[in-house]
Amino acid sequence: IYEVLEPDDRQPGWRNRSYLAKYDLKTGLLQPLTFGYHNVWAADISNDGRYLLMMTSQSRLTKRPTTLFSLYRLDMQTLQAELLIDKDGFISGARFSPDGTQVLVSGSPESLGGIGKNVKEGQTPSMTDGQLYLLNIADKRVTPLTKDFNPSVQRAVWNKADGQIYFTAENRDCYSLYRMNPADGKIQQLEVSEDLVNSFSLAQNAPVM
């Protein structure tokens, strides 16, 4: 007799779970950080190495969305975990601000209670429309950064050198490159010769891309 929890439970390896561990490059010691029946993965590490953003997932087949994600901040010194976002099926990632006091959250318009929705009442926004949100860790206040920005955000990086957020977005038939000031939310498209900017990399201590 076998208990099948959900359709995917028939697939080999479905019950395998991922966990996080800290590896000390100096001593070679490996310290497990998480354990349990939920998959856990790292979203980002603060610049000072003190905090870790980690996400977990769990299934909920009775209603949309069927997969829920939670976001935690783990103190690497005390191993205390702080819940930042609980069971949100529409977030997809998170990154620390350069000073570690804020979190840049990516997801669809329905993320975080639908604060990023920009459609008529009764309409459901596209789950593939990428949006950015700013979460203040101290008071958990969330600000939608791209609610009135039409292109769909793909990949975003918060630059340490100038404090600006750089991201690519699906702009009609192009993948364009943009820069955002997180202080006022102003977005500027960067003029580059390529129509399809698939990836980019930033220097941490210099204004170089």
What are these regions (language model features)?
Residues 1-19, 34-40, 55-71, 83-92, ...:
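A flexible loop/linker signature enriched in serine peptidases of the S9 family
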Residues 16-30:
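Thioester-forming pentapeptide GCGEQ
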Residues 30-49:
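A conserved hydrophobic secondary-structure block that centers on an alpha-helix together
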Residues 47-48, 98-99, 160-161, 203-205:
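Residue-level detector of Asp-centered blade-edge/turn motifs that repeat once per structural unit
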Residues 52, 103, 164-165, 207-209:
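Hydrophobic beta-strand positions that form the internal "hydrophobic ladder"
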Residues 162, 196-209:
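Serine-hydrolase catalytic core recognition
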